[in-house]
Amino acid sequence: MPQPAIIAKLEQQLRITIAPFDAPDLKAFMRYGRKGDDNSQYFLKDGKLTGLKLRTLGLKDTSFLEERELAGLQGLYLAENDFSSLQLPGHLQQLRLLHLADNKELKTLEFAGSMPLLEEIDLSDSGIQTLQLPACPALQKLDVSRSKLEAFSFASACPALWWLDLSGNGELRKLKMPAGFKALQYLYLYKSGIQELQINGKLPKLVVLDLEGNQLKQWPEKLLLPEGLETLYLEGNPIENIPETIRGSGERHNSVEDVRQYLLSIIDEDKVEYLHQAKMILVGNGEVGKTSIRLKLLDSKATLPKKKDRTQGLDIVPYELKALSPDLTGLEDAIDFQLNIWDFGGQGKYREVQQLFFSPQSLYLFVTACDDTPEDKESYVTFDYWMSLVHALSYDREQERSSPVIHVVNKIDKERMDIDQTAHNRFGNVEEFHAISCKHLTNFEALRKAIPRVLPKVGQGIFRDQYNEDWLGVMEELQRRQGEHHITYQEYRDEVCKDRLNDGEARAWLRILDRIGTVIYFGENEKLKDWIILNPNWVKQAVFEVIDSGERNPVPQWRFEKQIWSHYSEKEREKLFELLQAYDLAYKQQNAFGEQEFVVPALLEHESPNYQDLLPQEELPLKLRFAFKPILPAGTVNKLMVRLKDYIYRGLMWKDNVVFHHPDSNAYVQVEEDWQEHFIYLSVYGKQPSVIYETVTSTLKDINNDFKNAKFLKELEFTVEGFDGEEWMKKRLLKKAGADFFNFLWEKPGIHYKEEDEKNIMDQVKELIAKNRVGDALEMLKSLVPAHLEAEVLQLISRYSKLQRDSRMGILANNDENVERNRIVSSILNLASEAERDNDHTGLSDSSDQEDETFTNVTDQTKKILFICSSPSGKNLLDFGKEFKSIGIARQLADSRDDYAEPIIKTSVEADDLLHIMTKYQPDILHISLHSSKSKGLYFENNAGQAEPISAEDFKDIIETYASDPDGKGRIETIVLSCCDSEAYGRAITNFADHIVVTKDLFPDKAAVVYAKDFYRMLFNNKDIGFAHRSATSAIKRKKYPSDGFAHPIHEIPFLIKNDDK
């Protein structure tokens, strides 16, 4: 077909060559080559110029668009150029697709008028700052993600728009959407700096709303969440009219159900009231006057307590603040506010337990006194430790700050000591400093006034959070039943909530009541989550009765029943035992007579046993220490004793000390805690200590991670130091100094590799994973990967540690645990492969940008399998790791495995990359594992990792374009669509593949894994496709999966489409 005159004219004007491109349609033309080498192309349809692509040419001048011969253009692709501004002439009214991505210098885009046919605009990764969108009634997709938008507006609604992505524009500030967005399904506003969101009208089709990382202060008035909304991200927004506990916290936390129910609950303003309660926690050393302050706040004439009346552990009382002014609260009228005072005793023996009750979004009074001196070494704690503890344990991840603190110095009537009034400046959450005398009430009124003044710093919604009468009615009922001390979650639902709150609302309300100190709810603990403490004093008393019992370890169970907890029922004692064990406060064992007994580390004696004679004495012990920051939680070594109880050597344990021995080594380690100085000390005896050292350090890491997650800490880390005989040196300096006796610090127990073995990283990693030693594989990988991959390995180690913690606590469903583990394993294999490639050895990678990656050891007869998968944010995690692994295992076990190349996996695949990947690898078998929906499409990912569905027609375009490549293989032998409801997508591509496996219903992950394992096992043993399919469905049938909720038995869901028209 002759070249259009306008193309020749543009070639001369721009001094380039513009080649024709034969594509089945315009969308295929616009998609193909996005990451290819062909930058200048045109597309003809019926002999007319329909598409123009001028990509990566450094174009700055847009005057060529004024050519009237371009009036018929429907697709314009100008990505990756250097335009500073662009104005679309009025004659480009036929445009359907406009791609301007990666124009970093582009500041403005202007339209001459309405664009009646425009369906898609891509301005992602551009420098665009201002965009005024004209009337675009046909617009379906608008992507301006990761750009520089500061101002954006719609001239009118876009009734066909189903995808809007403005994420990553940090200065957008405001978004206003007129009524009429009836088709909008995906609205991405992640980290766009939005402070005000105005949505007029309903969004009935909305599926995903991503508002994470903005500065939104008010939820749009009367915007209720549509029934079809599946995902809502609100993390990081200081929204005042939705309580933080309802919004939830944590990166990528989906809060859709809790927020939906809350918005519905407050829709009737006549039934809505404020909560106006919070927790105030008094902390400090013993005998500094915390209880005196509490008594004087309640009654200034109250008698001060005697020493014998000092708080034992914890007292909880309400304190009413009267008539707080509108100037303070921001409300229209004065209000009363209730603070629930938690007064902690300062005795050292309670310190480990007290940490359980510290919480974010509370007001802390840290109390010291003029006579508060370190004479009593056991009970005295320094100012810095107390403040570090409060700063860490009160951290609120949602507000990214710690709870406010008022620093109070009592007893100024006594002999005055030097008080450093500026010390609190080291901690940003200390709001005020007050020196008082409870005895003479000196300056006490100033303290009383400071409490309400600091109160707004507790939380964003402390005065404004509203709840309807059903929620508040549930709270009142729980308070009436406080005399029962505790109830089960089911009793709470059936007898208290009744039909007033659904399950999501009921749990959210418990979290709020726990935060303000009304109840104690162990929602994060699988064993205790069905137990609700109505009277916090009751459970406090039970735990402190153990500590105050004076018993010696081990404590027989009968002594708990007959003496310590004799006034509790058998079921209550059982739950209390679970509480002690769940928080590593005790462990259970059997004595020589088979009787149950408990070891409670908090009851250990101070006196050290004569243990040195029991340990090797050939050489002096090696000295190590772990330096913790910002704190070392008191009782950390006690928790270590509980978790490593099987390694305690001959029962050698005493206050803050224990000796461990591993049966697989000849070494022993004495561990000592100095929580005030933030150190744990290790004395290592004997030979080859790497096993026991690794056991101790990995368990300490687990304890750290558990504590961080349970208390929502921002950080809690430790570094390793060794004593070389003269000074303490950090671990890395020990290695540089050549301290050979510390070589075990770099050994990996059970992992035998040498530096020269780095060429076989993948083999070593696979071997460890096959033995279910994922942690060891990660540690080995950390030692062998190049520097630029270390951060990724450390991230995987953190994820695996969290997975182990969640698994141990029982808070993960089996399926979720398997999914996360397999994702980690898949990432490990990818990193190992990349590390090998960096050592000039061929490996497999999961990076689409690695152009040197290929199938290994293949001939023209070798068949190639390409595994495409994606699990975008906002969707449940797919178990594709296990599915892919099953294919690899089947190949390794097959007699004829050399007929097939080792499969390649590509994760997090974008729809725009699929054709590029297929063209590169030329697979014989294409296996696709994705989320899918009959009505919405196959879910690939976009650049931000979010769900981007494509229709059956778009999927067909991609496969058809691939099959039409004259330089490629053409038809694909087999396509496996391991996706839910994939029949329509398979039917659309029947002309381009010989065999297609599809599904006619939802397809469970576990069934997909079984199918893949058996299907490929048969293929690898030279069975035909039909037989392999029948064998795989039979394997599913033998599993007898329940089919409740499915339209078909599970084994009938996958079926085979054959196409003999070759």
UniProtKB/Swiss-Prot annotation:
Task: Recall the GO molecular function terms of this protein's record.
Answer: serine-type peptidase activity
Task: For this UniProt record, give its keywords in alphabetical order, as a comma-separated list.
Answer: Antiviral defense, Hydrolase, Leucine-rich repeat, Protease, Repeat, Serine protease
Q: Which PROSITE patterns match?
A: LRR (PS51450)
Instruction: Give the GO biological process terms.
Output: defense response to virus; proteolysis
Domain (COR) ranges: 470-660
What Pfam family does this protein match (any one)?
Answer: EAD11
Annotated LRR repeat ranges: 70-94, 95-116, 115-141, 142-159, 160-180, 181-203, 204-226, 228-249
Known EC number(s)? 3.4.21.-
Active site per database record: 931, 980
Q: What class of enzyme is it?
A: hydrolase
- pH dependence of function: Active between pH 6.0 and 10.2.
Q: List every stretch annotated Disordered.
A: 836-856
Out of the domains of life, which is the source?
Bacteria
Entry function: A dedicated protease for substrate gasdermin bGSDM; cleaves the bGSDM precursor, releasing the pore-forming moiety, which integrates into the membrane and triggers cell death. Probably involved in defense against bacteriophages. Expression of bGSDM and this neighboring protease is highly toxic in E.coli.
Check the record and name the PANTHER family matching this protein: C-TERMINAL OF ROC (COR) DOMAIN-CONTAINING PROTEIN, PROTEIN TORNADO 1
Other remarks in the entry:
Might be a Bacteriodetes scaffold.
Q: What is this protein called?
A: Roc-COR-CHAT protease
Please give the organism.
Unknown prokaryotic organism
